[in-house]
Regions:
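Extended, helix-rich structural scaffolds rather than catalytic motifs
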Residues: 3-4
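Non-catalytic, well-ordered alpha-helical scaffold segments
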Residues: 9, 44-47, 62, 79-80
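K/E-rich alpha-helical interaction surfaces of small helical-bundle regulatory domains
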Residues: 76-88
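Surface positions of alpha-helical coiled-coils, especially the charged/polar e/g heptad sites
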Residues: 21, 28, 35, 42, ...
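Short, charge-rich amphipathic alpha-helices with coiled-coil/heptad character
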Residues: 9-33
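Short E/K-rich amphipathic alpha-helical oligomerization segments
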Residues: 51-73
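Amphipathic alpha-helical coiled-coil segments
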Residues: 32-46, 50-53, 85, 89-92, ...
Length: 103
């Protein structure tokens, strides 16, 4: 991570000193778009997995997670997996939102 941050800082210094560079700007825009698409694909896969549990247990994931966190559902392996998938999807959605705010 440190190497990446160092490179970004170097680019920032370069742009501040020499002005806007179309190639760098386009490359960064494409990189951001690629990462957003990557997040979309991961969220889509996790949402598909969550739908399986929602069909089996006839319950929305957000309702399930609230009940699970309150300890009302026990430690069934399905529930542990469902909870993990739900948390992973929510984390990815938060990260995607952060990345979108840079556009």
């Amino acid at each position: 991570m440190q190497q990446t941050l160092s490179k970004v800082k170097t680019l920032e210094k370069f742009i501040r000193k020499h002005g806007e560079d179309a190639f760098i700007s386009q490359t960064i825009a494409k990189l951001l778009e690629y990462k957003l698409q990557e997040y979309d694909e991961k969220v889509k896969r996790l949402s598909k997995d969550l739908k399986k549990f929602e069909r089996i247990y006839k319950k929305d994931s957000s309702v399930f997670f609230k009940e699970f966190k309150e300890g009302r559902l026990g430690d069934n392996m399905d529930f542990i997996e469902w909870s993990s998938l739900y948390q992973m999807r929510n984390r990815l959605l938060q990260e995607k939102t952060e990345l979108e705010s840079t556009k």
